[in-house]
């Protein structure tokens, strides 16, 4: 009986080692499980991006409005007979109106 018990304990120890520390053990399972979660997140982002691209393709295939909007926004195109007005931000407008000291001094010396 003693030899059988010893053999079973050795077998149990080997199985526990394989389960916890061996190839395809608990550590590998946890690592792969985390990798799967990360990959599912990436897949969800890519799926959303693909849906947006398919919607954009459908808009472009659907008619002239989407093509016209894209030409206006991305290429700055206008229709014949339209006027284009560029709005300058307030900070740039103030900087353009205030004369610098070098311009003032050069104007005074020329008179």
From Swiss-Prot:
InterPro entries: Cell_div_FtsB (IPR023081), FtsL/DivIC (IPR007060). It is found in: Cell inner membrane. GO terms for cellular component: cell division site; cell septum; plasma membrane. Keywords: Cell cycle, Cell division, Cell inner membrane, Cell membrane, Coiled coil, Membrane, Transmembrane, Transmembrane helix. Residues 97-111 have a biased composition (Low complexity). Its main location: membrane. Part of a complex composed of FtsB, FtsL and FtsQ. Belongs to the FtsB family. This is Cell division protein FtsB. It comes from Pectobacterium atrosepticum (strain SCRI 1043 / ATCC BAA-672) (Erwinia carotovora subsp. atroseptica). The lineage of its organism: Bacteria, Pseudomonadati, Pseudomonadota, Gammaproteobacteria, Enterobacterales.
């Amino acid at each position: 009986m003693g030899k059988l018990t010893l053999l079973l304990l050795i077998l149990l120890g080997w199985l526990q080692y394989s389960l916890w520390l061996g190839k395809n053990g608990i550590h590998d399972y946890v690592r792969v499980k985390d990798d799967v979660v990360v990959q599912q997140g990436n897949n969800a982002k890519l799926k959303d991006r693909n849906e947006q691209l398919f919607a954009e393709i459908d808009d472009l295939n659907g008619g002239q409005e989407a093509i016209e909007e894209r030409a206006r926004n991305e290429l700055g195109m206008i229709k014949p007979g339209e006027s284009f007005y560029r709005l300058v931000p307030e900070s740039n407008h103030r900087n353009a109106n205030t004369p610098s000291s070098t311009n003032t001094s050069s104007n005074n010396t020329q008179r």
